[in-house]
Amino acid sequence: MLFLPILILNLLIITHAIDIIPREVLFQDPKYSSVSLSPDAKQVGYVAPDENGIRNVFTRCSSCSYSRQVTFETEHPILNYVWTAIPDVILFTQDNHGDENTRIYKKNISATAIAADKTQRVVISEKPMVKAMILSNNLISETVLIGMNDENPALHNIYAFNCQTDELKLVLQNRRFSIFFFDNDLNVRLASEEGPDGEMIYYRPRSNEGARTTEQNTWVEYLRIQHDDKAITMPITFDKSNNFMYWIMGDGSDLGNLVVFPFEDPQQKEILYTAQRAQIGNVLIHPTDKTLLAVTEVYHKPELFVANETFMEDLQYLVNMKPSGSMNIVSMSIDMSTWLVTYSSSDEPYDIYLYRRWNKKAELFMSTRPELKKYTLNKQIGFDFRARDEMTIQAYLSLPPQAPLLKSSQVPDGDRPYANLGMIPAVPQKMIVLVHGGPKARDHYGFSPMNAWLTNRGYSVLQVNFRGSTGFGKRLTNAGNGEWGRKMHFDILDAVEFAVSKGIANRSEVAVMGGSYGGYETLVALTFTPQTFACGVDIVGPSNLISLVQAIPPYWLGFRKDLIKMVGADISDEEGRQSLQSRSPLFFADRVTKPIMIIQGANDPRVKQAESDQFVAALEKKHIPVTYLLYPDEGHGVRKPQNSMEQHGHIETFLQQCLGGETQPFQPGQYNSSAIIKKIGIEGAAIARQNLQIAQNQFAQQLPRGPVAPSIFYRPPVRAQRVMLAPNQNVMNRIFPVQG
């Protein structure tokens, strides 16, 4: 009874009106994205929508406020761009409506060239059905290395493009390798291919003069990385002499070590840094002398570890300038005198600061989404819980900013650590479980338009780095192998149970949503455990693991064994097909009893349109309600602003009908999107509910109950960064003591 007046007051507060953030503010292209500094620090480049809404490249003077548009594409938005060693010359990429067959162009962005012909560009690759990639660009040579799968769609040949003369020359004809690694002089030093057991085998050219083919007799084995170590093992770069290599190595370690060794003798490795709590994230290397400057780890929030004391004063100044944020260096000039810096924060969009080392001063240079400044955004809280098999799982919770919170004195003793973190609302919330894609990826801390939108509409958001995710060690990543639709799904269920047990979520008001693997998980949730979720939104998710494996893009064939390890079976034998079928939602579509929305891009090369078509057809055959949005000009996800705003308008209306959150008025077609909308009626809902009881009885045997109120393991420190002083870096000196 003591808490009753408080709860009544909180309920009154919760029903108070909030300012709805318009979808146009959240899902239009940001004013500034892909921000980078030119090598000479004179210009800052960025991608932004032009007056017609097409994403183009702009530049802004770094010492003044003058900005100008430098590309003038009228149909396809620019995906990305890079500076080159030639002043005023950039390369940029596009694709055809999301098909991921990337095209590459060179553009002279000087004022003189644009005045002469603003649309002029040099084609490097725009062949149909060819995926071109920028492989290596050292910002010193006039040459850039380009990869093109122009002969074999599964393999990329290597070409050298001269940014001065526009000459494109074949460097290596590839018949074998999926990955190449280059030194600072753009020489091919390593290549890799999958071994028979999914291990990664690195090769080096037999001759010091390099190789022009991939014939067996021209390459010798260099390193063999076992499959269990692949998730945290990778080459980073060469030192200035090209005689030593930096790697992150996973052998003998769950989180990995940053090491350096002579290229001629990889067994003579020296450990420079041992990861403490999370995998090593970014490795910051000096642009010219190639010495190690710093490393980052990201558990809940990024933490920075400094390796070079000449770098210390700069970083300490930047950390102190905004101690509540997590500092990140976005870009550096080639002489390292000028930096672009930003800070990760969940409750404000990214601001870009220009830092000049010679005067130790940073100034606000641009705000990526200034129109959001007037709104109150959510806070994102990192925490851990234990899954039913005792595996520690990291997750994030974002609550609506208007939701009143309970103090630690108002909750049971066991919940006080969570209340201290700001995780316990006065009343349980409507909740969206937002499942990341990959699945070899992770959710991160920081501003997200998706989180800002959902929490603004009155939903809490739960993001789970379930087993199979990356960033938390190879044990967690490898624990997902073969567990699609099983333990990876159980982790999501356990996270929901945790939220309900702590009073964070109302059990009857939990929805699930995600893209790619997250879309698959949504379909799994609504077919295998529909009683847990009120509704679901699947965005480009596969429904059939058999057809997913059959239809992988050709340029993924070099990683096929890794995919087979992930999904846990192959289609080459009947036992494998049965295993995949048993975890494919398509074959259990008649179990769906809750509202479902499916969103698909017609040009998706990863998850084909057939994945969604066949699931919708199965629902239609069983008279089960579904809303299907098909975008004929999109690929693996919805990118175009008019389509994105339309998509989120549909999702918002769908969630409001399911859970009752806030909405901004919406009419289909108001954004002039390309969406083709198909809705199947509700007459089959009763039939589907009858099928559910059988499904529940079958699936319940697979669901051993775990603890529903896991203990807290780690509270993020108040500090934004941890800075460690270290000796001047030398390529063979240990920088940090290895901690046991």
From Swiss-Prot:
It is a single-pass type II membrane protein. The chain crosses the membrane at residues 2-22. Residues 23-740 are lumenal. Its EC number is 3.4.14.-. Residues 1 are cytoplasmic. It is an enzyme of class 3 (hydrolase). Glycans are attached at N108, N308, N506, N672. Disulfide bonds join C535-C658. One of its GO terms (biological process) is proteolysis. The active site is at S516, D604, H636. InterPro entries: AB_hydrolase_fold, Peptidase_S9_cat. It holds the Pfam family Peptidase_S9. It is found in: Cell membrane. GO terms for molecular function: aminopeptidase activity; serine-type endopeptidase activity. Keywords: Aminopeptidase, Cell membrane, Disulfide bond, Glycoprotein, Hydrolase, Membrane, Protease, Serine protease, Signal-anchor, Transmembrane, Transmembrane helix. The keyword Disulfide bond applies. GO terms for cellular component: plasma membrane. Removes N-terminal dipeptides sequentially from polypeptides. Essential for control of distal tip cell migration. Belongs to the peptidase S9B family. DPPIV subfamily. This is Dipeptidyl peptidase family member 6. It comes from Caenorhabditis elegans. The gene is dpf-6.
